[in-house]
Structure formats: structure tokens, C-alpha cells
């Protein structure tokens, strides 16, 4: 099925120009059964990326636009009394979809954010005293504004850690933007996309990711990166055990996308920026450090096995 994964990447790259690496990161996060946070400016393609993944993978898609007056029931669903039967019937909310775009999640209140994050973590929803499983596969792509354009309720560190990866799309380069201006309307391109996989095949791939071999030396390498982040005076706190698990899972997924059944150090390095940078908070010293700066610093500090 690696050919199908390459087809997904190629198809998405024709719609989202010049962002193949970010597309691969998003796909790796999905294959690793994680959830993705995109922190970037409006208009750079966050919604388009979610739409393209949903169409290419044949997934049921729902966009939730978060606002400050949104309630948990608006996401999870609500029971409504039906006069004919004399009973309450549960009406599922938009969370009961396979791919969710949680747009501007930092606009919602902490209570509503917690409802989303519980569903992400548990793959189930508890509403009206009853627990209901969410569909498989289940993937959340959440967006929030950059730190200098914070919303009403920025996600706290403990909730940021629930996202397996965080990426930035950034502005397209000059050639990609020119091609975007001269090309076909993106909405028309998305509507014309054909599924490269079906949900059942995607679930099978997610199971196969767990079987990608990680040599003991690679486990040592991952542990060394995590331990260095904890000892380093550059960071307020280091990477958690959850981050180490995420790094391992995403490296396995990246290796699968590359068509291999084993993980190389290059796979760990490729996914490290997405896994680590939203979990690491540099000590403020007047120097602004980008996500890539942080990842490069970790890679350079830890010898490759």
C-alpha cells in the first residue's frame, strides 16, 4: 500500500503547492494514530490540507468553527425528547466524523476545549451518562493562531502535549504562489480528487505501522534526544515520556511512507520538529528561536548511533 501513500502525497501536492514535507508530516501523524495541530496565519492552506487528506483517503469530513460561545454539546451532541415515542434520542454532534477540522480551537472556552481533547484522547464520547465510541479512523486537525495573534483562550501546555505533532505551513515560495495564481481554483481541484485509499485500508496501515522495526540502537537514540532535552538549560522543561512515544510512532510512520519496514536515524530526525517543538519552551534570553532551530539543536547535540 506504499504506492497508495505516495499517490496521496502526489495528489495533495498538486493542490497544496510547495508543501510536500508538511503533507508528509500530516500523513505520518495520521498513520501513527495521533492528532495534528497547525499553528499558522489565516489563508496559508490549513483548511485545504484537511480537505485534501479527507478526499484522498475517503474519510468522512466535518469542519468545526470554534467560537467563544460554543458549548461542549455543540461538538459532542445532545439528547432531544421525542414526543411520539416519549423517550430521549441522542443526536450525535460533528465530532462523530472520521476527520475533524477544529478551526481556531483557541477561540473556545477551556470547558469546550476539554470536551474535544477528551474525545481525541479516548476515541470516545461520554454524553448524557452514556459512552459512545467514535468512528475509526479518527483524526483531528486543529488550528490556532500564532503566539502573537493569540485567541481568547490559548491552549495550555498540558493540552498542547495531547497533539502528537504540530506543524506550520508558512507562505509559499514565489514560484508556487505564481502557479497558484495562474492555476485552477483550489475548490474545483478538491472536488475532483479521487480516493487513493478507503477507511478500512487506512486502519490496516495504522496497524502495520506498529510492526515497523525499531532497532535497539534507535531506541537508544530516541532516549538520548529526550534525555538531552531534560538536562539542557535551554528549555524550561524537557520532553515527556508521551513525547518519546510520539517520536517513536511517527518515525515508524515516516519509514512506512518511505517504503521501508525499519526505522533509520533519518526518520527520527525528519519527524522531530513536528513532535518536539510545541512541547519544548526555550528559556527566554531575548533571542527568538524557530521550530527548526530547536530541532536542529537537538539533532546536533546527540550523536547518531
Annotate the PLM regions.
Residues 24-28, 81-101, 130:
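Conserved alpha-helical scaffold flanking the Walker A/P-loop in AAA+ ATPase domains
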Residues 231-305:
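C-terminal engagement/docking regions of AAA+ P-loop ATPases
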Residues 27-67:
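Walker A/P-loop
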Residues 56-84:
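AAA+/P-loop NTPase substrate/partner-engagement loops
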Residues 40, 103-104, 115:
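Walker B catalytic acidic pair
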Residues 2-44:
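Pre-Walker A (pre-P-loop) alpha-helix and adjacent loop at the N terminus of AAA/AAA+ ATPase modules
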Residues 82-87, 108-112, 120-211, 252-254:
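Canonical AAA+ ATPase core
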Residues 41, 75, 143:
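P-loop (Walker A) phosphate-binding loop of NTP-binding proteins
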Amino acid at each position: 500500500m506504499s504506492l497508495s501513500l505516495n499517490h496521496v502525497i502526489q495528489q495533495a501536492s498538486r493542490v497544496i503547492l510547495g508543501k510536500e514535507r508538511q503533507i508528509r508530516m500530516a500523513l505520518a501523524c495520521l498513520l501513527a494514530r495521533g492528532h495534528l495541530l497547525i499553528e499558522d496565519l489565516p489563508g496559508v492552506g490549513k483548511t485545504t490540507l484537511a480537505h485534501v487528506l479527507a478526499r484522498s483517503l475517503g474519510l468522512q469530513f466535518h469542519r468545526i468553527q470554534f467560537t467563544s460561545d460554543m458549548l461542549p454539546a455543540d461538538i459532542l451532541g445532545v439528547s432531544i425528547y421525542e414526543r411520539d415515542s416519549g423517550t430521549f434520542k441522542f443526536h450525535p454532534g460533528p465530532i462523530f466524523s472520521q476527520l475533524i477540522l477544529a478551526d481556531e480551537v483557541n477561540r473556545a472556552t477551556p470547558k469546550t476545549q476539554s470536551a474535544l481533547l477528551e474525545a481525541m484522547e479516548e476515541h470516545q464520547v461520554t454524553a448524557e451518562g452514556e459512552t459512545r465510541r467514535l468512528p475509526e479512523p479518527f483524526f483531528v486537525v486543529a488550528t490556532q493562531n500564532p503566539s502573537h495573534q493569540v485567541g481568547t483562550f490559548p491552549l495550555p501546555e498540558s493540552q498542547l502535549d495531547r497533539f502528537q505533532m504540530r506543524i506550520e505551513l508558512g507562505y509559499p515560495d514565489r514560484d508556487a504562489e505564481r502557479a497558484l495564481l495562474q492555476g485552477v481554483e483550489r475548490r474545483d481541484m478538491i472536488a475532483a480528487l479521487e480516493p487513493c485509499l478507503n477507511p478500512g485500508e487506512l486502519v490496516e496501515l495504522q496497524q502495520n505501522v506498529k510492526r515497523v522495526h525499531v532497532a535497539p540502537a534507535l531506541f537508544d537514540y530516541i532516549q538520548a534526544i529526550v534525555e538531552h532535552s531534560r538536562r539542557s538549560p535551554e528549555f524550561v522543561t524537557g520532553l515527556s515520556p508521551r513525547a518519546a512515544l510520539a517520536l517513536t510512532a511517527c518515525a515508524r510512520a515516516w519509514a512506512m511512507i518511505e517504503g521501508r519496514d525499519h526505522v533509520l536515524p533519518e526518520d527520527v530526525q525528519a519527524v522531530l520538529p513536528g513532535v518536539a517543538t510545541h512541547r519544548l519552551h526555550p528559556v527566554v534570553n531575548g533571542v527568538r528561536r524557530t521550530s527548526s532551530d530547536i530541532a536542529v539543536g537537538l539533532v546536533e547535540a546527540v550523536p547518531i548511533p
